[in-house]
């Protein structure tokens, strides 16, 4: 697979018009729906255009969400390929044919090959249901509760070959409640994801994100942010 250009400085430096994104899904597509609500057809002054919704599963409900919104959809079943590299080559071809500038993973349940990730270096983002670098991988809510952390949350990051290790773009913090179960905590984290992902993509589209020494820097971050305490501190 031929590698695309390695982007230096702002992720969208020199780009004219709206940022063209492709969204990759495998299931229900609730994060996709949030992106549709923020950037879909008919959204006034959107800095982002969704040029393709692609799934590796024909039965993914997210495809229905995309079709209802009038978005282009495509299915590439991974089971029809002899290996991961062949599947990723087909994926790469579809993304480039659609004119995608940024690839957005939204519940895409396939590990991508290092060659694909390098081809889309700093043009491939994911959202993870934990505050990275803590709780990489699966089953994050149960593991967070088992460790007794007082805050949990979600992270938007650029993708690297090692899972859940890429430069962190944005995070949302969700306080953990004493009676939380993995399910109840997961509901609140997912609600935070639906707000965080569109906000992070807008930062990229607006040219606010750079990658410097494999660290994502966001120039629009407010100064003197107020710390969050969990449990909340009692008033003096």
Which ranges hold each PLM region?
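Short beta->alpha connector loops at strand-helix junctions that form conserved
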Residues: 74-79, 127
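Donor/substrate-binding cores of folate-linked one-carbon enzymes
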Residues: 38, 106-219
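N-terminal glycine-rich "phosphate-gripper" loop used for MgATP/nucleotide binding
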Residues: 55-57, 79-80, 84-85, 98-114
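N-terminal Rossmann-like dinucleotide-binding module
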Residues: 2-61, 65
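An anion-binding loop in the catalytic cleft
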Residues: 2-20, 43-47, 75, 195-236
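Short, structured coil segments at secondary-structure junctions
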Residues: 69-70, 120
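Residue-level detector of anion-binding/catalytic polar loops
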Residues: 72, 101, 150
């Amino acid at each position: 697979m031929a590698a695309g250009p390695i982007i230096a400085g702002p992720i969208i430096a020199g780009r004219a018009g709206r940022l063209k994104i492709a969204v990759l899904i495998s299931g229900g597509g609730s994060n996709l729906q949030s992106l549709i609500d923020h950037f879909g057809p008919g959204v006034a002054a959107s800095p982002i255009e969704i040029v393709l919704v692609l799934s590796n599963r024909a039965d993914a409900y997210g495809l229905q969400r995309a079709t209802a919104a009038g978005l282009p959809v495509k299915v590439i079943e991974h089971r029809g390929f002899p290996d991961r590299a062949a599947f990723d080559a087909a994926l790469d071809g579809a993304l480039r044919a659609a004119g995608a500038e940024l690839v957005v993973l939204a519940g895409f349940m396939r590990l991508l090959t290092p060659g694909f990730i390098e081809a889309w270096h700093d043009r491939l983002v994911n959202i993870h249901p934990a505050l990275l670098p803590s709780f990489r991988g699966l089953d994050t809510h149960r593991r967070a509760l088992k460790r007794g952390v007082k805050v949990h949350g979600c992270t938007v990051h650029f993708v690297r070959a090692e899972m859940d290790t890429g430069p962190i773009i944005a995070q949302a913090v969700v306080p953990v409640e004493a009676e939380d179960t993995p399910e109840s905590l997961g509901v609140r984290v997912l609600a935070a994801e639906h707000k965080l992902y569109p906000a992070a993509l807008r930062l990229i589209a607006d040219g606010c994100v750079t990658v410097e020494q494999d660290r994502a820097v966001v120039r629009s971050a407010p100064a003197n942010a107020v710390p969050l305490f969990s449990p909340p501190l009692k008033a003096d």
